[in-house]
From Swiss-Prot:
One of its GO terms (cellular component) is plasma membrane. The chain crosses the membrane at residues 27-47, 69-89, 93-113, 134-154, 168-188, 199-219, 239-259, 262-282, 288-308, 337-357. This is Phospho-N-acetylmuramoyl-pentapeptide-transferase. The lineage of its organism: Bacteria, Pseudomonadati, Pseudomonadota, Alphaproteobacteria, Rhodobacterales. It catalyses: UDP-N-acetyl-alpha-D-muramoyl-L-alanyl-gamma-D-glutamyl-meso-2,6-diaminopimeloyl-D-alanyl-D-alanine + di-trans,octa-cis-undecaprenyl phosphate = di-trans,octa-cis-undecaprenyl diphospho-N-acetyl-alpha-D-muramoyl-L-alanyl-D-glutamyl-meso-2,6-diaminopimeloyl-D-alanyl-D-alanine + UMP. Its main location: membrane. It comes from Ruegeria sp. (strain TM1040). It is found in: Cell inner membrane.
Length: 360
């Protein structure tokens, strides 16, 4: 919205700053951060009052989690609210990729909100049926995948960019849209599975989003894309404003989610943020890089898949408990130890993901 202040500029005054994506990205970060600090405590008080017993805790989970009884959920409302407010304030409203990412974020956030509401209302961990959530997720992802494809340059449509390899695009043809659908749905559910410890999911999401934001800015500029020898996708630079807002809102939420958490993000936050990562990846055509920078989420999801399939086949378990962060809890690792080590892994993966821009 503030971008339109450039109309008041004569080319050399303060209003001219709003032309620059980097300036507006900084503004988006600070706006979302302040939003989180200002509205965080009041929101937690409202959630605690409305929810009473808070988020239901699984009886078969680690014993240490019983101490979390009474902690309110739906804290993702704070992140999504900060993200929406800040992005609308600082991003260009005529950019299709901004609206695409916001659409996916808000839509998956609504699915998560319905699930959280059902859990709190019924005081059980079931929530909305998994099949219903998956179906709705696929519907949203179909719209998003087609939306992204229509706004990509003709020479990039249905093309899958291969990281590291120079000028290598794999033409998936009619399989590209289904592939993008799986990326979005997979990312949303992988982040959802990761959100099981205080502070565990939000920092890796912020790291992945920050990395993808840098990539979006690079591929959205002709000069940067030529220098780095990556494909040019006009308009994706504005996504940096969204990811900056996500980073700021995430920090504001982490202030209250740090151990011991005063609030959980719930499915409201995890599905929204995971969907956002998937939407950014398909917008920038860096779907495979998402698997690198979001490698932690991939491992968490795979641990559940492996556990379920192996148990059905043999009646035994590979892990003490899945997702894998619970496996380490069962082994006696302290919750903060798991969280910080997973953060470190996320940072390493982000560096590897960024390196793919130059290693060609």
């Amino acid at each position: 919205m503030l971008y339109w202040l450039t109309a008041l500029s004569d080319g050399g005054d303060f209003f001219n700053l709003f032309r620059y994506i980097t300036f507006r990205a900084g503004g988006a970060f600070l706006t979302a951060l302040i939003f989180g600090f200002v509205f965080g405590k009041p929101l937690i008080n409202v959630l605690r009052k409305r929810q009473g017993k808070g988020q239901p805790i699984r009886d078969d989970g680690p014993e240490a989690h019983l101490a979390k009884v009474g902690t309110p959920t739906m804290g993702g409302l704070l992140i999504v609210g900060a993200l929406l407010f800040s992005t609308l304030m600082w991003a260009r409203w005529d950019n299709p990729f901004v609206w695409l990412v916001l659409f996916v974020t808000m839509s998956f956030g609504l699915i998560g909100f319905a699930d959280d509401y059902a859990k709190v209302s019924k005081q059980n961990t079931s929530g909305v049926s998994g099949k219903v959530r998956l179906l709705l997720g696929f519907v949203i992802a179909i719209v998003a995948a087609l939306w992204a494809s229509w706004n990509h340059p003709a020479e990039l449509q249905n093309q899958l960019a291969m990281p590291v390899f120079k000028d290598v695009l794999l033409n998936l043809g009619y399989l590209y849209v289904p592939f993008c659908i799986c990326v979005i749905v997979g990312a949303a559910n992988a982040v959802n599975l990761t959100d099981g410890l205080d502070g565990l999911a939000i920092m890796p999401v912020m790291i992945a989003a920050g990395t993808l934001g840098i990539i979006a800015y690079a591929v959205g500029r002709v000069d940067f894309s030529e220098y780095l020898d990556v494909h040019y996708v006009p308009g994706t630079g504005e996504i940096l404003i969204f990811t900056s807002a996500l980073f700021g809102g995430g920090l504001g939420f982490l202030w209250y989610n740090a151990p011991p958490a005063a609030v959980f993000m719930g499915d409201t936050g995890s599905l929204a943020l995971g969907g956002a990562l998937g939407a950014i990846a398909i917008s920038t055509k860096h779907e495979l890089v998402l698997a690198i920078v979001g490698g932690l989420f991939v491992v968490e999801a795979l641990s559940v898949i492996i556990q379920v399939l192996y148990f059905k086949r043999t009646g035994r378990r590979v892990f003490l408990m899945a997702p894998i962060h619970h496996h380490y809890e069962k082994k006696g690792w302290a919750e903060p130890t798991i969280v910080i080590r997973f953060w470190i892994i996320s940072l390493i993966l982000a560096m590897i993901g960024l390196a793919t821009l130059k290693v060609r």
